[in-house]
Amino acid sequence: MWAHGLARRIGTKVPPAVAHRRRNLLLIHLDGVPKALLDEAIVAGKLPFVSRLIRSGTFQLDDAFWGAPTSTPYFQAGLLYGLRNPNLPAYSWFDRELGRQVRMSTPTDAHVIDERLRGQGRESLLDGGGHGYFSLFRAGAQNALSMSTLASFKQMSRAFSYEMMGLSAGRTRGLWDFLGAFGMDTWRSAREVAHWAHALHDWRHEQSFLVSRVLLQRLGWSFAYTKALVDMVRGVPAVYLVFGNYDEVAHRRGPRSTLALSELYRVDAYLEDLYAMSQSVERPYDVIILSDHGHVDALPLEQRQGRRLESLLLEGAPGELSEDVIRGLRDGRPLQDPVPSAPFAPVIVECGNFAHVYLSGAREPLEARALLARHPEVLARATRSEDIGIVALRRGHSAVAVIRGGVYGPDEVERAPLSPEFSRRAVADFLRGLPAMKTAGDLVVFGEAVRRGGTVGFAWEFGSHGGLTRTEASSLVCWPANAPVDLSGLGHCAQLHDRLAEVYVRQAPRLRWVQ
């Protein structure tokens, strides 16, 4: 078996890991892959290795709901730290505490948020010698290959020799073979980007997408995959490996585009290699495969209306706010008199097929009565737009959704006139969590479902997640049938953390004293 030979070769070049746990864990995160799409690929024979694992009974496959919003920061905070309410409303938002917009693709922002999460006193699945690759948060990992660690050049330079350890010994392809394939991939990617941008007459994001295709999806993934092989030979107790290629392409080309599906199918061979190594090393690994959310087609508002969401909500005639909406938002309480507030230019953060609307710079979000008093015109535009399916906002100590002229709390969502594309479970879960999510907008608007598997999008992209459709809320988890853990029936990513910690961490995560 080739993996045994590779393991012996790597073992002669690298020292064993110092940390040990009762069982070793390899956690493979397929970013953005909904369970339905994986099922289709298995039936179509596009993922032969994964299909064999499941059909043989070696692995179990189940769908999972991780909570809402259906975004990677929220999921990773729950998975790694076990936080049920991490106060992470999207991939990008206006942070009331910092007084500015933050983006998880910005290393300094990711570092600030990681420190904030860590300060809540929970230990991570990666504490005690674990390694993470392409995670947003370092979360206590011994290595430094997450978005948050890129914030420190000094830290990265100190870690350079450690990160390179075993890379040459762990290669599975010859140098010239790799360079030839890399060159061909680069050429094809450049041609595809040029063709796409020319057809759309729009080059937005295309240069960064090309860089992502070449540096992250090819070089970066090859590096992370090789390092995971090396880590297993060394006996690193927990390895968290994020495969982001499908997600990156789905955003720019659509979740069912030929390019996105080819990235999904490509992962099958890597999974086969990783699994082979996991069973060939001295202390075998339990391999768990999961996804964080699904993807839906996004039809950009800018294409549909010729304007951005900011223009739709803040400009033009507001129209009348319906009496039913006013009554539902008041909930028997008297209207407030308009109260002068500090000047604040509204901030609208387009997060894909949903958006956060900030109408105040105060540390506390505006509640329904304050919005009725100060910003009735914005409420009217949002609730009357045919391209906005759900408007979520806080009402008293809870939250409600305005859907087609009606106001519904989390326990009333079942009778709301929602499109069948939306997940009522996800809508209710989001409303229950919104009061504690102080970083979320004063309004959170979700694009209307306009076709099967597709919603209006507010950002300039053609695949979105973070919203509340059934596809976005349907994730997957796949685990060994003989592993001492049951990952079926999970209803939140914090539950996943708890079940994994019970088995794969020396002791359950305990509260740390935070000064």
What would you call each of these model-derived segments?
Residues 1-59, 304:
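Active-site-proximal N-terminal segment of extracellular/periplasmic enzymes that hydrolyze or transfer
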Residues 20-39, 53, 79, 238-244, ...:
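Beta-strand elements within well-structured catalytic alpha/beta cores of enzymes
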Residues 40-77, 82-86:
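Short, structured active-site-proximal loop/turn typified by the sulfatase FGly-forming signature C/S-X-P-X-R
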Residues 78-254, 353-356, 409-420, 440, ...:
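His/Asp/Glu-rich, glycine-adjacent segments
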Residues 98, 104-140, 328-514:
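Active-site neighborhoods of enzymes that stabilize oxyanions during catalysis
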Residues 268-306, 400-402, 407, 414:
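Metal-dependent active-site segment of extracytoplasmic phospho-/sulfohydrolases and closely related
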